């Protein structure tokens, strides 16, 4: 690998904190991929992952997924992969991406990841800079956009096509996973590769907008820190529905997914184009999001509001405005704003809160639930916003709808 900037694992939270129930096994892991055998026995029949919009719309229980990961890992070994080897993976969210990711980790191998919309020159650079010995592409179209195909065919141990198409010298997915003998496919040789917590798990590359992409290795310790410490503030039950719309190769989405999987949640993959449909169909309890997504939902609601009859528009806007002033006044009285106020200044605000409360209460009973049902599928309790703060007007709107967004920056 070329010169890489290592990001040290953060220190764990104080042991005085009570660890989330039924999750003590996480503390004793050295590798992310070790969670699957634990989850296989803890919640094996629970749906682990479902691809709503992918080519094959595959879904797997935790037991099925654990077995697939073991099989994929054995197949990689059969193709000559060993601990410390790097494989470039160019693909978007799918159960196959997840199986490849965890199968590589099972061997102690490393993946250099990127999305399918990256420029070809950027993808060429990542494959070379990471010293990859193998390549995995989502489809033949991704393979065709690369510039040095002939050189890659000679140098790489394998080039795998996740979408299973037979094309040139690419190895189809079905051929790849059937390359290992059945009796060995369920043989979990985890300890043979001497997993260590400081092993590099993945290399994430920047977009390259200010020059060549920069590779940042993350270790298993980095990811395990996230899994362990997020459990102190959230502990969803097995089977809790999670809708995943962000790219899985992004560090924030990836860390969130590992955490949700460690809880036994059921994750559904979608894409932004179908988010509105899938959020009402799946009715997720948890979502990992970014500000732009909430802005789009917010703007979509107010665009839809414009199409309503004039009287209905005015009524809804009045009720939202009333709740807006009520919530803002209440925050200031409680000194939750940055600029705190004196007791004397709180007196007129208290009058505003008292006078606006009845209509606000009616809104929370009759208006807000209907709006939230249309926007978020009625069950969303933990919308996690990462990567930056919400614009103030968007944050205020969701707060008025009694939808708190947990922020992780």
Where in the sequence are the language-model features?
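Structural core segment of the AMP-binding/adenylate-forming
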Residues: 1, 106-179
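Single conserved hydrophobic/aromatic residue that forms the stacking wall/gate
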Residues: 400-409
């Amino acid at each position: 690998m070329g010169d890489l900037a290592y990001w040290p694992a953060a220190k764990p939270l104080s042991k005085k904190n009570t660890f989330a129930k039924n999750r003590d096994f996480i503390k004793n892991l050295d590798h992310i991929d070790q969670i699957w055998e634990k989850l296989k026995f803890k919640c094996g029949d629970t749906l682990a992952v479902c691809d709503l919009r992918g080519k094959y719309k595959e879904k797997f229980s935790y037991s099925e997924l654990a077995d697939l990961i073991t099989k994929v890992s054995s197949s990689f070994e059969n193709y000559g992969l060993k601990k410390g080897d790097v494989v470039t993976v160019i693909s978007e969210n799918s159960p196959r991406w997840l199986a490849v990711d965890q199968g590589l980790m099972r061997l102690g191998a490393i993946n250099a990841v990127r999305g399918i919309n990256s420029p070809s020159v950027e993808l060429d650079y990542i494959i070379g800079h990471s010293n990859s010995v193998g390549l995995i592409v989502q489809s033949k179209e991704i393979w065709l956009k690369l510039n040095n195909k002939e050189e890659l065919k000679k140098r790489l141990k394998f080039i795998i096509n996740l979408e299973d198409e037979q094309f040139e010298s690419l190895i189809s997915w079905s051929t790849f996973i059937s390359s290992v003998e059945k009796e060995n496919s369920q043989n979990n040789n985890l300890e043979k590769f001497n997993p260590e917590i400081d092993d590099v798990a993945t290399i994430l590359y920047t977009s390259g907008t200010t020059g060549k992409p920069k590779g940042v290795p993350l270790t298993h310790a980095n990811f395990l820190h996230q899994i362990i410490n997020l459990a102190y503030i959230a502990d969803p039950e097995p089977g809790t529905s999670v809708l995943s719309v962000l790219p899985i190769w992004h560090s924030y989405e990836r860390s969130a997914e590992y955490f949700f999987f460690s809880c036994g949640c059921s994750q559904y993959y979608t894409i932004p184009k179908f988010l509105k449909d899938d959020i009402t169909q799946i009715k997720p309890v948890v979502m990992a999001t970014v500000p732009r997504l909430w802005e789009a939902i917010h703007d979509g609601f107010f665009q839809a509001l414009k199409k309503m009859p004039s009287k209905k528009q005015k009524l809804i806007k009045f009720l939202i405005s009333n709740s807006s002033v009520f919530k803002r006044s209440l925050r200031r009285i409680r000194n939750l704003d940055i600029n705190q106020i004196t007791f004397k200044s709180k007196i007129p605000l208290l009058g505003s809160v008292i006078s606006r409360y009845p209509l606000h209460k009616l809104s929370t009973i009759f208006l807000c639930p209907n709006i939230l049902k249309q926007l978020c599928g009625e069950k969303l309790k933990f919308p996690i916003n990462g990567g930056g703060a919400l614009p103030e007007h968007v944050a205020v709107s969701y707060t008025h709808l009694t939808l708190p967004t947990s922020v992780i920056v």
